[in-house]
């Protein structure tokens, strides 16, 4: 889907591909946010694998109740694969999407202070999800909080 300057070597992602085999339809807003998130990750990230030098390509695919991580080197040669169960993240994901829906509705009808309160809740859930993700990736992937948050 997206790539960054391949000359930026180091412990970082330079390409991210999301497999949309589920065929799920997303709103234009959701697609825009997804594209921005990928762009932001590629612009600034910390991503490494124990015993492997970067840069890396990351292919993510949802398979049942797991996310399949396919990690490759800059030549697109596979160097690691693993599955991560979604279960531990399910509540945070569900709550986050609910708060986002509430936020988009609030933009049209609520006061700035009410919108700010909803946004603070969204950010707190985002942070919680980031911490959970980092814990789930511990030992498999080396990353920082900012990258996990994106």
Can you name each region flagged by the protein language model?
Residues 54-101:
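A surface-exposed, charged beta-strand/loop segment in the N-terminal or early-internal portion
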């Amino acid at each position: 889907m997206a790539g960054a300057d391949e000359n930026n070597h180091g412990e970082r992602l330079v390409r991210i591909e999301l497999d949309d085999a589920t065929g799920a339809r997303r709103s234009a807003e959701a697609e825009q946010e997804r594209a921005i998130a990928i762009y932001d990750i590629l612009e600034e990230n910390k991503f490494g694998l124990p015993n492997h030098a970067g840069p890396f390509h990351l292919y993510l695919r949802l398979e049942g109740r797991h996310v399949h991580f396919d990690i490759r080197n800059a030549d697109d040669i596979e160097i690691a694969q693993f599955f991560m169960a979604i279960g531990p993240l399910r509540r945070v994901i569900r709550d986050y999407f609910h708060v986002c829906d509430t936020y988009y509705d609030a933009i049209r009808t609520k006061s700035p202070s009410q919108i700010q309160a909803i946004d603070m809740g969204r950010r707190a859930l985002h942070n919680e999800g980031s911490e959970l993700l980092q814990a789930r990736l511990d030992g498999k992937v080396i990353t920082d909080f900012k990258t996990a948050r994106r």
